[in-house]
Amino acid sequence: MENKINVVMLCGRGQSSNMMFNGIAHHANIVGVIFDNKVSTKIMARRRIKNLGIIKVVGQVSFILINKLLKRVSMSRITQLALSYDLNDAPPHENITTYVDNINDEETINLLKKYNPQAVVVNGTRIISKKVLSSINAPFINTHMGVTPKYRGVHGGYWSLAMNDSENCGVTVHLVDQGIDTGEVLYQGFIQANENDNFNTYPIHQIAKAIPLMKAALDDARNNCISIKEGVLPSRLWYHPTILEYIKHWIQRGVK
């Protein structure tokens, strides 16, 4: 492909970021990858307790702990899906990789100005500050594992199925603003999960669907023809399920 777009990636540390990197690596000229450090569990818990209350958060933490075991059980299915979708989770080469304590640090801004990309691909970071978003003249484009704005927040694929809304089980590629998954929609795609899938395998279907959508968004950015599309309403912010919510939806709807 001629005249590849110059891209910087701002990423969380994890499998989906590596898969996105490798998925677009031959389509774009990725000049730098900046990995965000994970927000501490203590800080996250304090925020959740303030917003949701301690009982809800205890239920969420209980689910997160149980899900570590469920993820181990799901590894064979995850591997199977990654192979079937030809997904590669090898990390980016060290010579283009930088690790920062916080994606909103001055170091990130300095790197963005140094690289001066035509677009910034975002995957799995904390909320990006206005100072970072305005530091360069380039679109910041995020992959969200859910259909926005109806399934903002986390685990949008799971929640759409748990709410008996399988037609809106999908993924969104959108511009980044200062809200939580509130940026304008560029592309959306939908997935088909089956009885072999669960909480830990839905994201594999979603990242596979997202990669070609991100490529299309980068083509639009390269050609200066980004087009905004309507999302799916109503808007709602979702969090981790509690252990009781997870069990309830598994029993009532077979959503694991």
Task: Enumerate the predicted regions with their spans.
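One-carbon transfer enzymes
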Residues: 1-256
